[in-house]
From Swiss-Prot:
Membrane topology note: Single-pass membrane protein
Keyword flag Acetylation: no
Record-level GO BP terms: photosynthesis
Function recorded in the entry: May play a role in photosystem I and II biogenesis.
Gene transcribed to yield this protein: psbN
Name assigned to this protein: Protein PsbN
Upper taxonomic lineage: Eukaryota, Viridiplantae, Streptophyta, Embryophyta, Tracheophyta
Residue intervals passing through the bilayer: 5-27
Signal sequence segment: none
Keyword Transmembrane annotated: yes
UniProt similarity note: Belongs to the PsbN family.
Keyword set, alphabetical order: Chloroplast, Membrane, Plastid, Thylakoid, Transmembrane, Transmembrane helix
Amino acid sequence: METATLIAISISGLLVSFTGYALYTAFGQPSQQLRDPFEEHGD
């Protein structure tokens, strides 16, 4: 394979991995530990 192809595949894989981790953190099991500042400051 060419170097440019390997670099493009690597960057794409990293981007997909980061997006998956961000979605898991936002909506998965760790999301229960996140605090909501709007809920804490109820008027």
